[in-house]
Amino acid sequence: MGFERGGRGGARGGGRGGFGGDRGGRGGARGGSRGGFGGGRGGGAPRGRGGPRGGGRGGATRGRGGARGGAKGGAAGKKVIVEPHRHKGVFVARGGKEDLLATVNLVPGESVYGEKRISVENASKEEGGASTKTEYRIWNPFRSKLAAGILGGLETIYMKPGSKVLYLGAASGTSVSHVADIVGPTGSVYAVEFSHRSGRDLINMATRRTNVIPIVEDARKPMAYRMLLPMVDVIFADVAQPDQARIVGINAKLFLKQGGGLLISIKASCIDSTAPPEQVFASEVQKLREDKFFPKEQLTLEPYERDHAMVSCVYQQKEFVDN
């Protein structure tokens, strides 16, 4: 998908775990930038020092909104078709150079982090009726672990319209805003962030997305916010702490429904920078098993994040015995 981060020339290849490409000279094609699949800042066209920038800021004719990390991209003048993804509440925008993930904008006309927005006209089902428009927000996998996991092939994300989600490690709310789009006005996102600086941005975002409940607290102390949360359908965890498995476990005991889902992003270097990432991932999965989580799948977040894994689990706090 089209979120490459290229540069000034030379085929840099998969800078962060990408797929090939030599370094090249100053005027080369600058390949898979930060681990994308080809095309740098200006798309696939070779640039040279004085050459055209290509799709850098708006597609082939350099319109105003190009794909610098997927923020304001798209091919100028091309019709975009938006189709449902297999995960409910997630969509795929087709028609540009590459397919892009998207969510329905819960607050039409506003972006959260400078992401591109696409408006699609919906024909009226009644003859002679007025058509309506739906606005979508492009979801950048370089800015969201959940988007990276979906592109990596997650079988299930456990959340859909109407779901209640506990999001641990909400930061300034970039990913949270897309989760809020997915669950929609009938769902809720309880977003926990310890940093007061990021918490301010999170609160500002939540003033417009009223299904987001910002909680500026330490996720290690869930009793501090127990009165704010009901039982939730899924926990998404991106806390990047050495004891993150324990943090998830104590929150699950208080808030996660029996049979609920867990998606946890594991950053190997935050847990043990001396051990191989695969060994760290295996150790964390074992800790999750001890807390009654049953792993369903594990996948890497390359090329969007280096030495990260996403683990999907089902929570079974009670032991079931077959008669």
Swiss-Prot record:
Mod. after translation: By homology to other fibrillarins, some or all of the N-terminal domain arginines are modified to asymmetric dimethylarginine (DMA).
Pfam families: Fibrillarin (PF01269)
Annotated region described as Disordered, given as residue ranges: 1-80
Location(s) in or outside the cell: Nucleus, Nucleolus
Catalysis: reaction(s): L-glutaminyl-[histone H2A] + S-adenosyl-L-methionine = N(5)-methyl-L-glutaminyl-[histone H2A] + S-adenosyl-L-homocysteine + H(+)
Keywords: Methylation, Methyltransferase, Nucleus, Ribonucleoprotein, RNA-binding, rRNA processing, S-adenosyl-L-methionine, Transferase
Its job: S-adenosyl-L-methionine-dependent methyltransferase that has the ability to methylate both RNAs and proteins. Involved in pre-rRNA processing. Utilizes the methyl donor S-adenosyl-L-methionine to catalyze the site-specific 2'-hydroxyl methylation of ribose moieties in pre-ribosomal RNA. Site specificity is provided by a guide RNA that base pairs with the substrate. Methylation occurs at a characteristic distance from the sequence involved in base pairing with the guide RNA.
Protein name: rRNA 2'-O-methyltransferase fibrillarin
Organism: Neurospora crassa (strain ATCC 24698 / 74-OR23-1A / CBS 708.71 / DSM 1257 / FGSC 987)
Gene that encodes it: nop-1
